[in-house]
Curated annotation (Swiss-Prot):
Residues 13-24, 40-54, 75-87, 97-122, 287-296, 670-682 have a biased composition (Basic and acidic residues). Residues 26-39 have a biased composition (Basic residues). It comes from the Eukaryota. This is Cyclin-dependent kinase G-1. ATP binds at residues 355-363, 378. Residues 1-10 have a biased composition (Gly residues). The gene is CDKG-1. Residues 349-640 form the Protein kinase domain. It is an enzyme of class 2 (transferase).
Length: 693
């Protein structure tokens, strides 16, 4: 090798076994390699001279050269060559057309380095081994993939090439620490000026190469669809390292070709950076961290699980020029409540009057002193809670603060009183509830008005079900109206998030008049179908101006349902006989009498409903939960497209808001509340204990 002619250069001696025959087995090669460990010194220091730096292996330690080296001098070669394995002698420019045959034991050596003759330097095209994979750079030139098992000898070859290109040099003694066991310090015959010039040329070459760009989580497939702003990509710089210093580098894994949007870090130690602006982890190239948007994930804990202690640092790279920054991206406005700012005091609101008092709390009409806006203030009942915050109110706050839909009442914030037991929810003010409006009306809603209200109600329920939430207490008193014709769903005290597969829940949900038959019969595995049954009851109540099934107990409620819709059986409702309450004997009713309540043409002034409208009502009140219509299918029903068309919100009837005195003396025919039923059963004050106790 050329390094031998400039005394003082001695490379590492690595035993490499050559395959002399194509048919020699791998075991024979390993046996021969074990018996002759001193043969075939490493004379391939000039192999792959024109390739860029890659990952190198020496004595079990991986070393990385962060930059390419200048191409070596091409030599004419003759003769035939054989197949090459990783680590074998190669000649020429290091391209796939060059190689060397195995060395013989009797060949001369200089300074411990075996020299290869020109006749032995060329390989036969027929026996040339195909090298893969092939990497194409930006200029269209083909480069061979880096060999991950090459040792530190490539670094020696870099210095050897510098010496080979100079005619006069200044001897420089570089005492380097040995890399691994069995290696001694190297004596380098290098010109200081040449090394500095080589580093400058290499930095220029690095700037001409294409580098992968950094990218944050906002541009990944997990980002919001509304975040369509143009993200700025900041290219990551490399730190130039001399060939001698690269020997002492720590290990790092080889980076494969990046996919679009993949974050690559070319640092010499395994580290990761955490952007303080976006809270997104940007790890090393062999890590693939994906943070799903919307999940409450502790970034610090996620990082500690994947990286050892001391490796999660803010921009933990070598030098300021190696620091990668995640640019700030403007996000679209979203539903977000900053709880860290603290809650406002209830004293910042002026009380006007009391709106309603129910099972879950008292509702006041107040004015915000800061903005002058009229809002509703709902006080959470805490006197019966001994173990902390009420679970029903906690669920309601959690759901309403995370939802934003025109058909769902908006919770603006949570405020506190003088002590920790006075908790209030600030909600948008709605003048009426649907039940109170219907009781003040002299005539029921027309079909066009019912269509307008049902469309808004179905859109809100569809939004809940699409977000895996069951309301479980839909009724006319939980539907709010304003004088602009808008309907909003409220009172999420019994709502629950559900998943797949379904989990068993309590059957004591939904106010009795709007409770689905599977709940009345004791089913604990239920889904969105229970809300759709409630919508059917509400639709019938809107058309008739009265409750559809006004039972006084669970048995009475089932009896009224069966008398109207017919008694179910296994043919109508598969699985009916397996329900706990199916053992109770009810009167046999074979016909569906629902049509008798809603005539297509009425001469007596009763509620009218077209054939399409009756079909929708009948599908909402289907016994089998699996066959009951969904909110999405109900929105696409033909009843909403036939005449008369749904009335516009602006033309819906308006009513004056009731004052506190009118509400106090107003007697509502209220249906039993599910929570009151449970309390009465626990206290043993309910004479009719229903089907289950």
């Amino acid at each position: 090798m050329a390094a031998g002619s400039h005394g003082g250069y001695r490379g590492y001696e690595v035993a490499r076994e050559r395959e002399h025959d194509v048919g020699v087995s791998r075991r024979s090669k390993e046996h021969y390699h074990h018996r002759h460990p001193s043969r075939h010194r490493d004379s391939e220091r000039r192999r792959d001279g024109g390739r860029s730096g890659g990952r190198e292996l020496s004595n079990g330690y991986s070393h990385r050269r962060d930059s390419p080296r200048p191409p070596p001098r091409r030599r004419p070669s003759e003769g035939r060559t054989e197949d090459r394995e990783p680590g074998e002698v190669s000649g020429g420019s290091g391209s796939e057309r060059s190689g060397e045959r195995p060395m013989k034991t009797g060949e001369p050596r200089e300074n411990g380095v075996t020299r290869v003759s020109k006749e032995e330097a060329k390989m036969s095209p027929s026996k040339k081994r195909k090298q893969s994979p092939v990497i194409w750079d930006r200029n269209g030139s083909k480069r061979q993939a880096r060999d991950p098992v090459r040792g530190i000898r490539e670094v020696d070859a870099v210095v050897a090439e510098i010496i080979m290109h100079q005619s006069h040099s200044l001897p420089v003694m570089s005492s380097l620490s040995s890399i691994g066991d069995g290696h001694s310090p190297m004596i380098l015959d290098v010109s200081v000026d040449k090394v500095q010039e080589y580093e400058k040329n290499r930095i220029v070459d690095e700037e001409e190469e294409g580098y992968p760009t950094m990218r944050n989580i906002l541009t990944s497939r997990w980002a919001d669809a509304g975040d369509e702003e143009e993200n700025v990509f900041v290219p990551k710089k490399k730190k130039s390292v001399s060939p001698v210093d690269s020997i002492e580098r720590g290990s790092t894994k080889k980076v494969t070709s990046p996919e679009s949007g993949e974050v690559l870090v070319y640092n010499s130690v395994r580290s990761s950076s955490r952007s303080s602006d976006s809270g997104v982890l940007q790890g090393s190239a062999n890590r693939d961290l994906e943070v799903e948007k919307g999940d409450n994930i502790d970034v610090e804990e996620a990082a500690d699980d994947d990286y050892p202690a001391g490796h999660l640092l803010d921009s933990d790279f070598e030098g300021e020029d190696c620091r990668s920054e995640t640019p700030e991206c403007t996000r679209s406005p979203r539903r977000c409540i900053n709880m860290l700012q603290g809650c406002r005091s209830v004293d910042e609101f002026e009380r006007l009057n009391t709106i309603n008092e129910g099972t879950y709390g008292v509702v006041f009409r107040v004015r915000d002193k800061r903005t002058g806006e009229i809002v509703a203030l709902k006080k959470v009942k805490m006197e019966k809670e001994r173990e902390g915050f009420p679970l029903t109110s906690l669920r309601e706050m959690n759901i309403l603060l995370s939802f934003h839909h025109p058909s769902i009442v908006e919770v603006k914030e949570v405020v506190v009183g003088s002590n920790d037991r006075d908790i209030f929810m600030v909600m948008e003010y709605m003048e009426h509830d649907l039940k109170g409006v219907m009781e003040t009306m002299k005539q029921p809603y027309s079909q066009s008005e019912v269509k307008c209200l049902m469309l808004q109600l179905l859109e809100g329920v569809k939004y809940l079900h699409d977000n895996w939430v069951l309301h479980r207490d839909l009724k006319t008193s939980n539907l709010l109206l304003n004088n602009r014709g808008e309907l909003k769903i409220c009172d999420f005290g019994l709502s629950r998030q559900y998943g797949s597969p379904l989990k068993p829940y309590t059957q004591l949900v939904v106010t009795l008049w709007y409770r689905a038959p599977e709940l009345l019969l004791g089913a604990k595995d239920y889904s969105t179908a229970i809300d759709m049954w409630s919508l059917g009851c509400i639709m019938g109540e809107l058309l008739s101006k009265g409750p559809l099934f006004n039972g006084k107990s669970e048995i009475d409620q089932l009896d009224k349902i069966f008398r109207t819709l017919g008694t179910p059986d296994e043919n109508i409702w598969p699985g009916y006989s397996k329900l706990p309450g199916a053992t109770v004997k009810f009167g046999k009713q074979t016909h569906n009498r629902l049509r008798d309540k809603f005539r297509a043409v009425s001469f007596t002034g009763g509620p009218m409903l077209s054939e399409a409208g009756f079909d929708l009502l009948n599908r909402l009140l289907t016994y089998d939960p699996e066959k009951r219509i969904s909110a999405e299918d109900a929105l696409n029903h033909e009843w909403f497209r036939e005449l008369p068309l749904p009335r516009s919100k602006d033309f819906m009837p308006t009513f004056p808001a009731l004052n506190e005195q009118d509400r106090r003396f107003k007697k509502h025919m209220k249906s039993p509340d599910p929570l009151e039923e449970q309390r009465m059963k626990e206290q043993g004050n309910n004479g009719d204990r229903g089907l289950f106790g």
